[in-house]
């Protein structure tokens, strides 16, 4: 359960040990999406009038695309999160980008959108299928991890020809 009644939070803190399924609708607009359910552990408590504080961890796997060969790559995200939620109209928080504003028409605090955002911020931006990935041939597009391609070695850029001649003359 990742949604909480705000009224109960003012009375006591809530400990959370739950999962956020990879099939949850909160991921519908996300790219990348988790490849397994996210493990969510933490504590949610009142932090003042109309304010609530979450601290905990978010952990899960992600399927990515290798930046070199465009094959499948995977990653793991394990991040500690500190989040502040505030009811709309709470003094001093309207313009703070680090505060998640709560819908004043509801008496519910839903952690899922904020946890989704925090997880996405920590997904690796550069994924490799393996450390020694050779990538794709820039000429024919063959995957060099499978084997060498049949392309001829690339001809030198003609703009560098004058420098090549100077180097040969010095020898």
Where are the regions that the model predicts?
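Structured interface patches
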Residues: 1-171
